[in-house]
Swiss-Prot record:
Annotated protein name in UniProt: UDP-N-acetylglucosamine 1-carboxyvinyltransferase
SUPFAM superfamilies xref list: EPT/RTPC-like
Assigned GO CC terms: cytoplasm
Known pathway: Cell wall biogenesis; peptidoglycan biosynthesis
Gene Ontology BP, a term: cell division
Family: Belongs to the EPSP synthase family. MurA subfamily.
Residue list for modification 2-(S-cysteinyl)pyruvic acid O-phosphothioketal: 116
Originating organism: Campylobacter lari (strain RM2100 / D67 / ATCC BAA-1060)
Domain of life: Bacteria
Catalytic-site annotation from UniProt: 116
């Protein structure tokens, strides 16, 4: 097992290039199941979750090449419809193959998913929508077994679901007739999926809103055009927090500030300022790091995937910060590890109260999920002494070239063997 060893630093400086968004790439890779031709994807991050999903497609009969952040995926010879547990267990996003497989073949079996252990994250909403589209759904021995010819339907998600929206959009693409989807997630990653499918010939209206009309092709596969993955707004937010927690000036390249509205607003409230251009953001040091109140919510609200990083940052604030986590239960598992570093944090249900300005000290800590891992890195940068972060396979699922990017900013960070 490998771990990261990080020395606390006074300041960071320099530039970091933001990778393509993993959470945009995953549904788009799954959507290649709907393609009659080769899908060509650029700016694809080389992280573990991407490689896992590509392996799953290969296991189903597809072929692909992937190098220098560019992939070609050919699903013409895809001839299997069982997404097996040994691959799916590695990450929850594998469930995104359910909608397109069922739409294309009329039957499939997809193992119930794995991934980060942050709450239930049920797929009930996916299954209910597919049933309303005419699918027969059973859960057998840990698999979702689905069959049936999909028909357009009027659907409304009881709660906003990103992967649910993506799955049903892909299912509706090849269905017979019109699907009307209400309460759709509006995340930039969902929007890009819709835009790519529209470019491929799908008649889809309302892109970017919470109401979509999708006119299915009755089984006819789509003609994909080459496309480029949007920048990763969560990776960008993480590096902005790295600049903030060390009160440094750093610059992010290949970033879309329009996707970071809530994150930038909270950093401004904490005293930081920015220089923003078309594809770059520079964060400037604060005269004083102020406390902040954060309520996580669906896009365009404050992203739950940035909650842990802001908790680490709030430890440097001059006062008491409040974080109210409304989207997932069990998403404060990083708190016990931050306490080991000297943090003063109190939990009451889904609300965390963070007392800032206390000194942090290097310690041995354990990553519990992807975003919690990045929070521990941020805390280690601001701590006195050396920290060791264990179970970093979580980081490798979602952050590309993390050590190199931090080293380029002046961090003292090493990957070592246990």
């Amino acid at each position: 097992m490998t771990y990261l060893e990080i020395d606390g630093v006074e300041k960071l400086s320099g530039e970091v290039i933001i990778s393509g968004a993993k959470n945009a790439a995953l549904p788009l890779i799954a959507s290649s199941i709907l393609a009659k031709n080769e899908a060509q994807i650029s700016n694809l991050p080389n992280v573990a979750d991407i490689c896992t999903l590509l392996s799953l497609l290969k296991n189903l009969g597809a072929s692909y090449t992937f190098e220098n952040n560019f992939a070609k995926i050919n699903t013409k010879d895809l001839n299997k419809t069982i997404a097996k547990y040994d691959i799916v267990r590695k990450m929850r996003a594998s469930i995104l193959t359910l909608g397109p497989l069922l739409a294309r073949f009329g039957n499939c079996e997809v193992s119930l998913p794995g991934g980060c252990a942050i709450g239930q994250r049920p797929i009930d909403l996916h299954l209910l929508a597919l049933e309303k589209m005419g699918a027969n759904i059973e859960i057998k021995q840990g698999y979702v077994v689905a069959s049936g010819k999909l028909k357009g339907a009027d659907l409304m998600f009881d709660k906003i679901t990103v992967t649910g929206s993506e799955n049903i959009i892909m299912a509706a693409a090849l269905a017979h007739g019109k699907t009307r989807l209400l309460n759709v997630a509006k995340e930039p990653e969902v929007v890009q999926l819709c835009e790519v499918l529209a470019e491929a010939g799908l008649d889809i209206k309302g892109v970017g809103s919470d109401e979509l009309e999708i006119y299915g092709t009755s089984g006819e596969l789509l003609e994909f055009k080459p496309f480029k993955i949007i920048p990763d707004r969560i990776e960008a937010g993480t590096y902005l927090c790295a600049g903030a927690i060390t009160n440094s000036k750093i610059t992010l390249k290949n970033v879309n500030a329009n996707h970071l509205g809530a994150v930038l607003a909270k950093l401004e409230q904490m005293g930081f300022s920015f220089d923003i251009s078309e594809d770059s953001i520079s964060i400037n040091p604060a005269k004083e790091i102020k406390p902040v109140e954060i309520l996580t919510s669906e896009y365009p609200g404050f992203p739950t995937d940035m909650q842990a990083q802001f908790m680490a940052l709030a430890l440097r604030a001059n006062g008491v910060s409040i974080i109210d986590e409304r989207l997932f239960e069990n998403r404060f598992m990083h708190v016990s590890e931050l306490l080991r570093m000297g943090a003063d944090i109190r939990l009451n249900g889904h609300i965390a109260t963070i007392n800032g300005t206390k000194e942090l000290f290097g310690a041995d800590v354990m990553a519990t999920d992807l975003r919690a891992s990045s929070a521990l890195i941020l805390a280690a940068l601001a701590a006195k002494g050396t920290s060791k972060i264990h179970r970093i396979y979580h980081l490798d699922r979602g952050y590309e070239n993390l050590e190199e990017k931090f080293k380029n900013l002046g961090a003292s960070i090493r990957r070592l063997e246990e």
